[in-house]
């Protein structure tokens, strides 16, 4: 049974209710401060921009309702998937052996969702304002008989300025997607919410622009009122007693020039720009909801200690790959060898050997025969056969060449167990050249075969041990290589014993050419 879809019906309903929340009411209209032609033109442009914004906001409100309906439609589809899964669970609980039917994808029902709202086209007054050409007395009466402080337009400006933050706050209702659900339908709704939230923030900026255009208008009007002749000027002119008609005409011309300058400055200073808001983003259809839209989180990992893939392999027996572990142990890689070198000579030529090389037989109790001398003359003082027998849990080498490989050398090549002295196996010479082939005359004891007070006399069991354990590796006299160089002493605490090579192939006798031993009654060998 597939994993459960992640959704919470109450959480989705809360988000849907939030998306269809009512937007705070926007600013209302304003009245013209006077009846000048310039004023009427600018006022008409401001009202056209405000009406365009309001119609666009209504389209945004529709999109919020459409997103809310889409969330509810997706929740219904998710619920149908859950019903399918519940029916499947009941079928399994009743013991049915029939194969479970595949869960059908459910397409959210968007049929009841209204379409996007079309924003009506509105004509923006683009013609230039007619020039206010009139007597200064008539202009003064028009200007000063109206709203000289332009209080209505200033209130209009302040409302739109404050509405910017209101719209930004309204857009935050859509910023965060619904919690507790996921899947393709959830991502579609969440993306629609984010786009609409950004759009509302942009509409807030458009409100700020409209407020700035209104500020341009009221500032120009304030200058007009301040610079234009007033009604007191008209009264004073009419009540004045002029000495001559020339004086009267001269005074009138001065007032007319002042009026015209003020009106021209007003017309030039009240030029505003049209506000052109973009239409809101529209959510389309929702993708089908499938069982398994939510990716399952892995609850367990393959393998474990001693299990498949764990890389651990237990067991005993030197060189054996088997054991009591749960899986096949990984074999360590052997160092790459030159075809002209035997496996053992590769090791001795490349690095120092920390201890005697274990035999491939994996003897668990054998050791150096008591009284015998250690094999592999010239080996470090800490080398040789461990006292407790050969070490166990030594992995075998998987890449050993075959017997017919031309790279193999005779069994006598390389430092192995002492042919004439049958102690231990595989204690080769570190960093020493290859020894000559062993003949029948080269395996007899020599005066130099003793080391450290030991007697280099072959024993009855030593030869057999040398043949069994050092097969293919021995072939050098017990004293061969004595004194060829000083070995660095190894600290077993810092450099523990490490299996560098394990012999795992058919081998030849390591004591070729031995003559039958004769024992006397005294127990001495001859």
Curated annotation (Swiss-Prot):
Q: Where is the composition biased (Gly residues)?
A: 303-328, 363-387, 413-429, 451-484
Q: Where is the composition biased (Low complexity)?
A: 335-362, 393-405, 430-440
Q: What happens when the gene is disrupted?
A: Loss of DNA conjugation when disrupted in recipient strain; strain still secretes EsxB.
GO CC terms: extracellular region
The question of whether Signal is a record keyword is answered with no
Q: Which UniProt keywords apply?
A: Secreted
Q: Which InterPro entries match?
A: EspB_PE (IPR041275), EspB_PPE (IPR054056)
**Chain residue ranges for the region called Disordered:** 1-35, 91-110, 271-526
- Cell location: Secreted
Residue ranges with Basic and acidic residues bias: 1-23, 485-508
What domain of life?
A: Bacteria
- Key word Secreted present: yes
Pfam family of the protein (one): EspB_PE
Q: Which family does it belong to?
A: Belongs to the EspB family.
Function per UniProt: Involved in DNA conjugation, at least in the recipient strain.
Other comments on record: DNA conjugation in M.smegmatis is unidirectional with distinct donor and recipient strains; mc(2)155 is a donor strain while MKD8 is a recipient strain. Mutations in a donor strain that alter DNA transfer do not always alter DNA transfer in a recipient strain.
| Protein's recorded name | ESX-1 secretion-associated protein EspB
């Amino acid at each position: 049974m597939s994993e459960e879809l992640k959704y919470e019906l109450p959480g989705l309903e809360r988000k849907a209710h939030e998306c269809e929340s009512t937007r705070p009411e926007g600013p209302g209209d304003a009245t013209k401060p006077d009846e000048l032609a310039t004023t009427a033109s600018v006022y008409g442009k401001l009202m056209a921009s405000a009406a365009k914004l309001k119609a666009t906001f209504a389209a945004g409100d529709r999109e919020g309702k459409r997103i809310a309906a889409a969330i509810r439609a997706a929740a219904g589809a998710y619920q149908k998937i859950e019903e399918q899964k519940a029916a499947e669970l009941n079928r399994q609980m009743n013991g049915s052996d029939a194969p479970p039917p595949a869960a059908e994808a459910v397409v959210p029902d968007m049929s009841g969702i209204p379409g996007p709202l079309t924003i009506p086209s509105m004509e923006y007054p683009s013609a230039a304002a007619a020039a206010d050409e009139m007597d200064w007395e008539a202009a003064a009466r028009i200007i000063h008989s109206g709203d000289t402080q332009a209080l209505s337009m200033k209130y209009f400006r302040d409302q739109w300025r404050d509405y910017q933050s209101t719209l930004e706050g309204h857009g935050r209702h859509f910023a965060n997607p619904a919690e507790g659900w996921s899947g393709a339908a959830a991502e579609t709704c969440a993306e629609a919410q984010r786009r609409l939230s950004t759009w509302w923030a942009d509409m807030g900026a458009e409100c700020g622009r409209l407020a700035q255009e209104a500020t341009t208008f009221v500032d120009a009007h304030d200058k007009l009122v301040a610079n234009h002749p007033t009604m007191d000027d008209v009264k004073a002119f009419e009540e004045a007693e002029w000495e001559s008609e020339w004086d009267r005409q001269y005074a009138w011309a001065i007032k007319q020039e002042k009026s015209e300058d003020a009106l021209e400055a007003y017309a030039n200073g009240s030029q505003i720009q049209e506000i052109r808001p973009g239409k809101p983003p529209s959510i389309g259809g929702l993708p089908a909801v499938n069982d398994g839209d939510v990716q399952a989180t892995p609850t367990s990992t393959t393998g474990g200690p001693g299990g498949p893939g764990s890389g651990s392999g237990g067991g005993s027996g030197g060189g054996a790959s088997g054991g009591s572990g749960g899986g096949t142990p990984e074999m360590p890689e052997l160092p790459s060898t030159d075809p002209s070198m035997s496996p053992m000579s590769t090791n001795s030529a490349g690095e120092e050997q920390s201890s005697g090389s274990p035999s491939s037989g994996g003897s668990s109790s054998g050791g150096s025969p008591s009284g015998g001398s250690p094999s592999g003359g010239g080996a470090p003082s800490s080398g040789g056969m461990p006292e407790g027998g050969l070490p166990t849990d030594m992995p075998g080498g998987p890449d050993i060449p075959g017997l017919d490989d031309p790279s193999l050398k005779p069994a006598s090549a390389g430092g192995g167990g002492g042919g004439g002295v049958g102690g231990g196996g595989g204690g080769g010479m570190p960093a020493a050249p290859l020894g000559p082939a062993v003949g029948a005359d080269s395996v007899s004891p020599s005066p130099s075969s003793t080391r450290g007070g030991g007697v280099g006399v072959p024993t009855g069991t030593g030869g057999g041990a040398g043949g069994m354990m050092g097969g293919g590796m021995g072939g050098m006299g017990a004293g061969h290589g004595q004194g060829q160089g000083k070995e660095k002493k190894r600290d077993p605490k810092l450099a523990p014993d490490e299996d560098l090579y394990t012999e795992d192939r058919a081998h030849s006798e390591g004591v070729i050419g031995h003559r039958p031993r004769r024992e006397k009654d005294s127990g001495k060998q001859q």
